[in-house]
A protein has these predicted regions:
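Extended beta-strand/beta-hairpin segments
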Residues: 1-47, 58-139
Length: 139
């Protein structure tokens, strides 16, 4: 499978990237020449990680017939101080809430571990350049 993204310069530091499923609007902060009109590229990497693992977990829980009322993935990344600034430490927090959560913790943990260890390609990419950890929280 091959993915192609076309990022077209608009003005200043403003780009519109076309990809599968729609467009992404990117821009830089004002202090580096942008106008704050869109998302920043590095945080979008964290968005991709949260989306990838989140979709895995939802799909796996559905197959396991586990219903959760609330689910969110929070990703925090710490950048290096020197250029090129890359994420060196990443933490993924999974939050689950709902009536079935207490009786389904084993299945929830299995779903998260399968995403982290087997299915989420974005998680695996992050492993190549960052220390990445995760934690599961029950609301």
């Amino acid at each position: 499978m091959k993915h192609t993204v076309v990022s077209e310069w608009q003005s200043g530091m403003h780009f519109v990237a076309d990809s599968v499923g729609g467009n992404a609007i990117l821009d830089a902060d004002e202090e580096v020449g942008g106008k704050g009109l869109g998302k920043r590229p590095k945080p979008l990497m964290l968005v991709s990680l949260a989306g990838c693992t989140g979709m895995d977990v939802v799909s796996l829980l559905k197959k396991m017939r586990v219903e959760v009322d609330d689910f969110r993935v929070e990703v925090n990344g710490e950048l290096t101080d020197e250029h090129p600034k890359t994420y060196h430490t990443v933490k993924v927090d999974y939050y689950f809430g709902g009536e079935e959560v207490a009786s389904s913790k084993d299945k929830i943990e299995k779903a998260v571990n399968l995403s982290v260890d087997k299915y989420c390609g974005v998680y695996e990419m992050f492993r190549q350049f960052a220390t990445i950890t995760f934690e599961i929280h029950y609301l």
